[in-house]
A protein has these predicted regions:
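Rossmann-fold NAD(P) dinucleotide-binding segment
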Residues: 63-122
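Hydrophobic beta-strand scaffold residues
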Residues: 37, 59, 122-124, 166, ...
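Helical "substrate-binding/catalytic lid" subdomain
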Residues: 178-271
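Rossmann-fold dinucleotide-binding core
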Residues: 104-185
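Glycine- and other small-residue-rich loops at beta-strand/loop junctions that grip anionic moieties
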Residues: 19, 75, 101-102, 148, ...
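NAD(P)+-binding Rossmann beta1-loop-alpha1 motif at the extreme N-terminus of oxidoreductases
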Residues: 2-68
């Protein structure tokens, strides 16, 4: 589909931090909808540079240049870096909209919202559920950007016609982050438990009978899931810590996902 045909709304000038595997695909969907998307290319890896080129992103030298003409900043980064990215944007004097689309606890989202509000920056809470989706490879994709907070409908309108689906949850910042946390608590928390079950079975020498008891199809599914997880374990460690904080904040037990964080830390050492 030609870029002009995908977007049904006037274009918006967007700054993206950063074009990792997920961020680059978000940028690609936005550029396919006719929105100019810029990024900071200073000191970025060749792999990141290549993703940005593929997504059609416009390079900027620094944050000051990125924010100078932007109407919207989108933050897609590892959870541990979310606050630092927000501080960097606030320091530039930018006063537009800010889509916080990271896997972070609602408590951290609230702290970032307070920080940005002091600088007259308007936060929209976002959470991405699903894998990277590119306009050229979108058949059957269910990847969704969930949104909450004021101006959520404005953000959703940017992606009309895009393979990246959107869902506006409410006008309350924190709801999108909470959804991401409980979803990942199950999906990625279960993967960590699976990894440790297989590890313990191996240590006790009962891996083969476990395979028989569970069935080869189940074990094969586990192995496929773990193979795709290993390279992202360093990110998932931080995500599990955010989930533990999310649980703790409402009096639920954080220990499950603190342990999952430790499992992903071990996996990241063997990627």
């Amino acid at each position: 589909m030609p870029p002009a045909a995908m977007g049904l709304n006037p274009s918006m000038r967007i700054g993206l931090l950063h074009p990792g595997a997920m961020g680059a695909s978000v940028g690609a969907c936005l550029t396919a909808c006719g929105h100019p998307v810029s990024w900071v290319n200073h000191n970025r890896s060749p792999a990141t540079q290549a993703r940005a080129v593929r997504a059609g992103l416009r390079p900027c030298a620094d944050l000051a240049q990125l924010t100078q003409d932007a109407e919207l900043i989108i933050s897609v980064c590892p959870p541990h870096a979310a606050t630092e990215v927000a501080r960097g944007i606030a320091a530039t004097g930018y006063q537009g909209q800010y889509l916080e689309a990271n896997a972070i606890a609602p408590t951290k989202l609230a702290a970032i919202d307070a920080l940005l509000s002091e600088h007259h920056i308007h936060l929209i809470d976002g959470s991405l559920i699903g894998g990277p989706v590119w306009p050229s490879e979108s058949a059957g994709s269910q990847t969704t950007l969930h949104l909450s907070g004021p101006d959520s409908n404005t953000i959703a309108a940017l992606l009309v016609g895009s393979p990246l689906k959107t869902a506006v949850l409410s006008d309350q910042p924190g709801d999108a982050s909470a959804l991401k946390m409980v979803f990942a608590a199950f999906s990625k928390g279960s993967a960590a438990l699976t990894a440790e079950i297989l590890n313990v079975a191996e240590q006790y020498g009962v891996r083969a009978p476990l395979s028989q008891a569970l069935g080869q199809q189940t074990i094969a599914q586990w192995h496929r899931a773990l193979a795709s997880t290993a390279s992202k374990a360093w990110r998932f460690e931080g995500e599990m810590q955010e989930i533990a904080e999310t649980f703790s904040a409402v009096g639920a037990e954080p220990g499950f996902h603190q342990a999952a964080a430790a499992v992903y830390q071990k996996l990241s050492a063997h990627k």
